[in-house]
């Protein structure tokens, strides 16, 4: 029977590189998803343990759910989820969590988002984007000066009514389901925070480009709708790109076609899918790290609290992420010299390449 200490030692050794007794062929076999054959002779990939983040640069026209399904299939991952829906109309950052990274999704969802979006003036639509039908029109067009004067009204903590076509729940049903059935249900305003809102371009009177950085729960479509109403000309989103989600910015994003190409190279033994993964702890960017000994790690791994007192006691409290020999072990609460594990990570399987471990 494997002891907790042996289990910890095993997990630590996984993070220190490939087993010296393992051949390159073995590595390539692991990098490429395993395959079996169905009765109809079509290949079937075995599900496997994959842990990390894929900062997908989602293309226009794909839903967030579809994107998760594609990434999950490419990695043959057992578990996957995303950290914040991105409309089909939109492109850009959709962080997808695989395996144990799904335990850190809330930390990303609570982070800031940054968008670059274009508003088409003169028409309000029921979806607040180009996919809907017009519900109000105007021949008026705003000047850059009028727009600039309006921006402070939408900066800071404000109240915002979500779009009719949104995932907000009303008596257990999604607002977009009710809207598709023809029901117009009044939605209550919600507090949101917009940290920055800038007019980036206003080359013609019919369209304006904005950049916004906002907190959790903000709807950019609602922002365009409300600006159009206050300007007296109506408006809707005609282009939208998310450029930041928590710790994931455009420099870390990978286009879907690049991910597919990497998957193809890995299948032929010429690439490593781990190169597309970011470490699980990337999502814990704003949380302090705390290194512990192997003995303490073994206790935490069993779900037991650890006392950290005396001269070497850490001078901090609250939520921390715990590491042992540089390897993520757990999320824990630290207070009064006691470290209590809340989420323990089991990172056996495919993880981010060493050069992406920070």
Swiss-Prot record:
Q: Specify the domain of life of the species encoding this protein.
A: Bacteria
| Spans annotated as Disordered | 1-50
The answer to whether keyword Mitochondrion applies is no
Chain coiled-coil ranges: none
Question: Which biological process terms from the Gene Ontology are attached to this UniProt entry?
Answer: mRNA pseudouridine synthesis; tRNA pseudouridine synthesis
Q: Which UniProt keywords apply?
A: Isomerase, tRNA processing
Q: Any S-S bridges, and between which cysteines?
A: none
Among Gene3D superfamilies, the record links this protein to: Pseudouridine synthase
Question: What catalytic activity is recorded?
Answer: uridine(55) in tRNA = pseudouridine(55) in tRNA
Task: Quote the SUPFAM superfamilies the UniProt record gives.
Answer: Pseudouridine synthase (SSF55120)
Enumerate the GO terms in the molecular function aspect.
RNA binding; tRNA pseudouridine(55) synthase activity
Q: Quote the EC number.
A: 5.4.99.25
Annotated active site:
87 (nucleophile)
Which PANTHER family is this protein grouped with?
PSEUDOURIDYLATE SYNTHASE TRUB1, TRNA-PSEUDOURIDINE SYNTHASE
Q: What is this protein for, i.e. what is its function?
A: Responsible for synthesis of pseudouridine from uracil-55 in the psi GC loop of transfer RNAs.
Tell me the protein family, please.
Belongs to the pseudouridine synthase TruB family. Type 1 subfamily.
Q: Which HAMAP family match?
A: TruB_bact
Tell me what this protein is called.
Answer: tRNA pseudouridine synthase B
Q: What gene name is listed for this protein?
A: truB
